[in-house]
Amino acid sequence: MSEKETNYVENLLTQLENELNEDNLPEDINTLLRKCSLNLVTVVSLPDMDVKPLLATIKRFLTSNVSYDSLNYDYLLDVVDKLVPMADFDDVLEVYSAEDLVKALRSEIDPLKVAACRVIENSQPKGLFATSNIIDILLDILFDEKVENDKLITAIEKALERLSTDELIRRRLFDNNLPYLVSVKGRMETVSFVRLIDFLTIEFQFISGPEFKDIIFCFTKEEILKSVEDILVFIELVNYYTKFLLEIRNQDKYWALRHVKKILPVFAQLFEDTENYPDVRAFSTNCLLQLFAEVSRIEEDEYSLFKTMDKDSLKIGSEAKLITEWLELINPQYLVKYHKDVVENYFHVSGYSIGMLRNLSADEECFNAIRNKFSAEIVLRLPYLEQMQVVETLTRYEYTSKFLLNEMPKVMGSLIGDGSAGAIIDLETVHYRNSALRNLLDKGEEKLSVWYEPLLREYSKAVNGKNYSTGSETKIADCR
């Protein structure tokens, strides 16, 4: 950003400070606050401005026992949120000392508490408050069922997430506060329990193996069964384990699997036992299916964990009304290995099978089990939107693209036929068609062979509204 533009923002902030210090707040003060907030995102620093006086002025409003009806406190907090990261944190501490932050968090003024969280979130170094009771107070507020201010809860969660990259903060959370966290977990009160699950989900991404504590991050069979009494709590618990497994895969935290493997079958048992636990199927089928999908991606010992859950409880293929969901969600490598007959017998190309196709085609062996279900005649009988959904799916992988290019030239003709680009007005159809063209072009000229030029020409018409010509390739690439 230019010096001129930076000066403009600094002048706006100076104007804001002056107007906030007037005896009577101007009528347009909220407009100015909003203007400052919007412009602060355009700068990375304020080199010629001392922000302490403005922060002190804002602090005066937040700590005042008088509530100013004409002042939008959300806008005021937004300015604090953007201003604090730009300031030297030593300067911030001159205005908001550690003692001030403690007083703010213990006050009855929610905007002041939120402002304190914004300051704490940006502390430098991040472990600055690890030896103070500030972290303890944040946890007390977070798990207080009487606290109903969503903005405050969000501010606390955001602050803890930002600071938890620091090992000292994590020690404060899970060593000093372990007995307290265990007590929150043990009472299983809906509000605090759901917040605890959200908190643990956030924290797990930062936890290393030696830091992991089963007593707080894992749940017993008894706790899971008790959670069914409040189906919302049970759903949160299911989602927690789903995110837990996803984090294991995404962050390569396979050391954590041994902590949860024994308890995961309990969810499958509850799913099966509709007689004793009817609410589980009635209200949590979708989230449970997502959990089972994640378990099916644990490849350890030839999918032994999911294979056992499948054999003992889920029984994929035995319940006709769930086959679609299984084929849409479960790891296609597992399906083709252990339920190839279900895949071959149930999948058919239609507008209703797009979700299944997207999942099954993600594995080459599984796709080979269904490729004989395709023919140009079957695909071309579909409405054009559904044609494009099928084609777009077939362009996602090398092996499916090769099948489309070599085995279904008539379908390719429908994709790049004369006038297609200009004739389509439905935005969803345009999206899938353009995505299919782009996916194929990404395979490169050599693999596309004779299809390359017509695909490039059609994509140019779709994106630029004109035919491709020499020199336009850069423009096409820029639009992709």
From Swiss-Prot:
Entry-linked InterPro entries: ARM-type_fold, HSM3_C, HSM3_N
Keywords noted in UniProt: Chaperone, Cytoplasm, DNA damage, DNA repair
Any matching Pfam family: HSM3_C
Molecular function as annotated in GO: protein folding chaperone
UniProt main location, coarse: cytoplasm
Subcellular location: Cytoplasm
GO CC terms: cytoplasm; cytosol; nucleus
Gene Ontology biological process terms from the UniProt entry: mismatch repair; proteasome regulatory particle assembly
Entry similarity comment: Belongs to the proteasome subunit S5B/HSM3 family.
UniProt function note: Involved in DNA mismatch repair in slow-growing cells. Acts as a chaperone during the assembly of the 26S proteasome, specifically of the base subcomplex of the 19S regulatory complex (RC).
Subunit structure: Interacts with RPT1, RPT2, RPT3, RPT5, RPT6, RPN1 and RPN2. Part of transient complex (BP1) containing HSM3, RPT1, RPT2 and RPT5 formed during the assembly of the 26S proteasome.
Extra facts: Present with 468 molecules/cell in log phase SD medium.
Name under which the protein is recorded: DNA mismatch repair protein HSM3
